[in-house]
């Protein structure tokens, strides 16, 4: 389903770059997670999935600056040259708690996302500054970074305006891909796992088992992988099974192909 941002919508029978596509995104790519992300990419390649979107955090939790890590830079350069897409994924991937936060804000940013909803309520100015800093930190990469995806998909109204003004071509939410250049929205629910607690794992496995069946006939299927998923046997087994089944009749492509 394609929805125009003005509220109109129509079925998407054969849109360029969308038909029978599979987008696999690796979240939280940083110097801290480089080794495990590399193992994930190796296993995906064994499944025939050789192009993904890599969601890069410029300075994870203020303690892993990409700009100071030449080994990570070279690793990312090599991955991009082999066909993977770099995507800006916040700046710190962390939102500091405010004593003025409402109950809704606390539930959203601390329970739902464990304090990582960085772009949930940033001002336009602060969001712009972090976006520009992130692009500067990733300037060692050749080519334009066309996508920005907020941590936990929590992108406030002013922050989204900053993303548009900075020239990004798209962003995503958990339920859609928003293409700024086309002023439209591809409705597609991302499959994503949570392994922070036992009950979250059980809920994720049940939810994605059902959702995996529902999305089989959709034009676009999205799979979001976080580094901890790889270390949880049940979650990773389900991910591999889904990808094996979905990749048979779908073209694996990064988000950037949808916005081109």
What are the functions of these language-model segments?
Residues 22-26, 52-54, 86-89, 145-148, ...:
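Hydrophobic faces of well-ordered beta-strands that scaffold small-molecule active sites
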